[in-house]
Amino acid sequence: MTTTLAPAPTGNRAPHGDAAPGGARRGATGRALWFAAVAVPGLFLAVFFLWPVATMILKGFAAPDATAHPVWSPAWDLGGFGEVLGRPRTWRVVGLTFLQAGLGTVLSVLLGLPGAYVLYRRTFPGRAFVRAVVTVPFVLPTVVVGVAFRSLFMDAGPLGGLGLDQSLTAIVVALVFFNYSVVVRTVGGFWAQLDARPEQAARALGASPLRVLRTVTLPALAPAIASAAALVFFFCATAFGTVLILGGSRFGTIETEIYVRTTQFLDLRAAAVLSVLQLVVVAAVLWVSGRASARRVRALALLGAAPGERRLRLRGLGAGGAASLAVTAVVVLGLLVWPMTNLLVRSLRTADGAWTLQNYRNLAEPVAGSSVTAWQAAGTSLRTAAVAAVIAVIVGGLVALVVSRRPRSRAGRRGLALLDGVFMLPLGVSAVTVGFGFLVTLDRPLGLGVDLRASGLLVPVAQAVVAIPIVVRTVLPVLRALDPRLREAAATLGARPGRVLATVDLPLVTRPLGLAVGFAFAVSLGEFGATAFLARPDSATLPVVIFRLIGRPGAENFGTALAAAVVLAVVTATVMVVAEQMRGDKAGEL
């Protein structure tokens, strides 16, 4: 398989019969480089993901009186499955997870379809700006969104009279806020490439606009809608920070229950069972998402010969188009813009409504119960996110480079598919499980006398684990679109494997790599689940500080949390606006 990945140069340019030895040396070098490209990410994932997660889960399944490390302990007690699954609370949490994810998915699709039509099928001045506004919520840190909607629904907020604070409705609305752009971008990008002639033919035959939509347009959009719905369900089912802030003790998901069981009750058996249960749910959802995505790709391939996309202006929308425009305007202004605007306004006012900058001045004061200020936490967040982004881009870039190869053998193709799937696992495992697994595993690992939990690299490594799948999905489509004959031609002309990568692959992935850096940085900046376990008191990140502030009573603490959330939102949005400028035509969509 390795010789297929990097064809060795023939060496026919070498004089005096040295071609074979030179070609053999270059072939050996190529194989060594490809082995390293697989081994380095594999070792990273094994040490910093598979080992901690397996240790965490196995520790929960060890017998209660077992004192040895669970990986090597013969004392097993799988009765924890029956005990935990027999608790009414467990099934209540599972039911709430599916209920919240189901409601969030349905509402996101229903509201996102009109937005996809307006923003991708129609054209108007400022459309690119509106698209950017729609995209920003998806990359905002979860604690920022949680604080923003909490400030809307709490008693002193604009919607406090509705009694929705810490309710199921508040959670679902926040989930739609996050995932609206997933539907708009996934369905809209597909819709923009649909051939308009079938719709025109149906209208010419007398079909009403509603019937055209029902019998022609929606069936054609079905693969994209299914793909978007599966992704939204996945994001809703694994939501953590937003649900933890808005749900309180009444509402939660499997993800938040793992956190509660681990931090408040030290019930590792329950946390382990719930982690396995979440893995099963996520695996099923990702399988459905993969099938739907494959259908969407095949449908796009069939559209390849269709005429170029034809966007219509907003004039002459008709009743259906006008309704889509109205729904989109209400969603963008009311659901996306208003919560963040309210967050900014509330951060500039006192509890009695007076305008002030005191909340921002408080960012320079130590947070209650800590010697760290919010500004210091912001600096820590920027530094750790930068390190995490570098790690994620290096590891994720190597994975994408290897997976993009096209081996001739079926075994080679299956091996690369397996490698791709393994590096997607961090998407399906609770960040809480990863974080606590770090604490358990790195406490003098393998009998070493060094406690690695005090290392300053622990937080960025955990954040990088979460960001690697995003880097892979951003860069991989570009590498797969590269014609392999270009690499083969360069190798035939005598270029070594490293030079082939530098002169053929790298120039094409520079812009997508910039986008991947932005995504990795933004994800790491707002990561909360694993960081909540690993951040030391003197090096807390800004999301951790915000969560601590809203957990303390007093209007001053909440006002400081609002100001800190605004700072975090502005930094994240700025990073993503810059990163989006690096997007190429074939860069992956998240």
Where are the regions a protein language model picked out?
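Short, membrane-interfacial amphipathic segments enriched in basic
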Residues: G17-D18, G22-R26, T67-L78, E83-V84, ...
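Membrane-water interface segments at the C-terminal ends of transmembrane alpha-helices
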Residues: G30-T67, G82-A192, A220-G241, I245-G247, ...
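Glycine-rich helix-loop "coupling/hinge" segments at transmembrane-helix boundaries
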Residues: P70, G241-L266, T350-G353, F528-F558
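A short glycine-centered flexible hinge/capping loop motif at secondary-structure junctions
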Residues: S108, L205-A207, L493-A495
